[in-house]
């Protein structure tokens, strides 16, 4: 409930050098008076002693106050920066929890209040969640673009064009003889709507790039048994992930590790050797390997140069790099390989990482980071584009029906940013946050 005042640990779990406790809601000023003696100057750090109701000191620290609506949540907000021990936090939380109308925040409740009070839209909220969980440089940059409102500004500008088009058409329908209504607005409106359709279509094509940055570029290691697949996974991961033996068919399941290559999240998969298997367990492993290949962004086709075998039924249309392995066992490799490596000596591994990085980066050539990054963005944009296309192409339909399609297109755009009813999405989105955000 927005009438409650909420509090939570906003920094990392204790013990730590400093912990930040965030408070938001109508009782924030009263809490500061009770705990710190008075309300400090707006947006200024004040060194205070935090005390219990019995005037016993809990800790010394910095107190900051941000009056609403000029705060993160749009409400009165306070931050207490204190020592990050479990005992200090327990004592502080005991005092806060004992105040009527004050309670511990739920997951993402601070951000949800920011959304409810118009401080953030849904895309910005999702960008904030992604920024908190970002592990690579490109994830950070994409999250900053979204949390700063760059993507939302694009969607808002498109929504305004749709609203203007509807207004002009409806004005022409309702007031055909008025001098204030431009005559024959149809040509102007539908020309702009065609441009908008092209803009949205181009934007939608970049959705896969956003998904790759956020969810990872899938690289599958494939090849015949004993081609060195598990050894390569371990070498690139720089740790023992997969069991390596000379026995063919050791790998039965798909193993996966995350790599940071040139700022991109790369999901690397080790798979069972591709061959006709008799063992039921190995057969299932081969099946899973083929499923992984089908979903891959890139396949590393490994060939043992000391005993070259390439699975004959491998889909050659799949984006792939042919890698000759066990370079240390042959004098000169064939020119049939894009790259030759030895996991024993490390020869060629750096070049392979660089090659993967270049291939990933090529997917983003010429793209800005103002791109959709989630499946729900993609779904709403697809529906928006379909409604807009229907409005443009159904030239023989009643003008009011075409205008209704424009309204639907604007509604689908609004669902992305939360400008229209998206109540069913909110619990899912805000549950991704930690308690103190």
From Swiss-Prot:
Sites where the protein binds GTP: 226-231, 245-251, 270-273
Cofactors required: K(+)
Keyword Cell membrane: no
Domain of life of the native organism: Bacteria
GO cellular component: cytoplasm
Compartments (UniProt record): Cytoplasm
Note describing how the cofactor binds: Binds 1 potassium ion per subunit.
Positions bound to (6S)-5-formyl-5,6,7,8-tetrahydrofolate: 22, 79, 119, 437
The UniProt record lists the keyword tRNA processing: yes
GO-annotated molecular function: GTP binding; GTPase activity; metal ion binding
Record-linked Pfam families: MMR_HSR1, MnmE_helical, TrmE_N
Swiss-Prot/TrEMBL keywords: Cytoplasm, GTP-binding, Hydrolase, Magnesium, Metal-binding, Nucleotide-binding, Potassium, tRNA processing
UniProt xrefs under Gene3D superfamilies: P-loop containing nucleotide triphosphate hydrolases (3.40.50.300), Probable tRNA modification gtpase trme, domain 1 (3.30.1360.120), tRNA modification GTPase MnmE domain 2 (1.20.120.430)
InterPro entries, alphabetized: G_TrmE, GTP-bd, GTP-bd_TrmE_N, GTPase_MnmE, MnmE_dom2, MnmE_helical, P-loop_NTPase, Small_GTP-bd
Similarity remark: Belongs to the TRAFAC class TrmE-Era-EngA-EngB-Septin-like GTPase superfamily. TrmE GTPase family.
Subunit and interaction comment: Homodimer. Heterotetramer of two MnmE and two MnmG subunits.
Protein name listed in UniProt: tRNA modification GTPase MnmE
Native organism: Rhizobium etli (strain ATCC 51251 / DSM 11541 / JCM 21823 / NBRC 15573 / CFN 42)
